Regions:
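Short, Lys/Arg-enriched N-terminal segment that forms or immediately precedes the first helix
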Residues: 8-21
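Short, leucine-enriched amphipathic alpha-helices that occur as contiguous helical runs
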Residues: 10, 27-28
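Pre-recognition alpha-helix immediately N-terminal to the DNA-recognition helix
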Residues: 29-34
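Short capping segments at the starts of secondary-structure elements
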Residues: 37-43
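A short acidic, leucine-rich amphipathic alpha-helix
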Residues: 46-52, 63
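Basic amphipathic alpha-helical segments that dock to polyanions
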Residues: 63-73
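Non-DNA-binding regulatory cores of transcription-related proteins
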Residues: 72-156
């Protein structure tokens, strides 16, 4: 789980900045705080809306650059489906997988010990050692499936 204060994440970011000769900035700290507190996968536009409630002077380009920096520092990952990139915090998170709506891009996290057990069993059977993995299961969310069903009914 992401720490509630973001203290560890800020330390990771600070170390990354030092290693790459970059400066700390108040804007990056505000963006990191908002990103961690969002508690969900966010698009650039969503994060911009959250950040601008605190700092109206932070622009879209700064959000993009900060999210790239967070990715480079190992604090965020990017998922792009449905034509829109979404970002999620990575640091100190429990392992989880994703259902992703291919129509609207909404992302649903899930945990399944059963799936984890099955893949470990299969890996052992072929002499494979899993070091990391991600499951991204594409489909349609309830809303998009209902829209598609209604659209099909109207045509038919």
């Amino acid at each position: 789980m992401v720490s509630t204060t973001g203290r560890e994440e800020k330390q990771v970011l600070a170390a990354h900045l030092v290693r790459h000769g970059l400066k700390r900035s108040r804007q990056r700290e505000v963006i990191l705080d908002a990103f961690l507190k969002a508690g969900r996968h966010v698009s650039v536009e969503e994060l911009l809306g959250i950040v601008r409630r605190r700092r109206a002077d932070i622009g879209r380009t700064t959000i993009y650059r900060s999210l790239k920096l967070f990715k480079d520092a190992g604090l965020a990952s990017e998922l792009t489906y449905g034509g829109e990139a979404r970002f999620e915090p990575l640091w100190n998170r429990d392992h989880h997988d994703h259902f992703i709506c291919g129509s609207c891009g909404e992302i649903f996290e899930f945990k399944s010990p059963e799936i984890e057990h099955i893949q470990e069993k299969i890996a052992r059977g072929i002499g494979f050692r899993i070091e990391a993995h991600r499951h991204h299961i594409l489909g349609r969310c309830r809303k998009c499936a209902a829209k598609a069903s209604r659209a099909g009914t109207r045509r038919g």
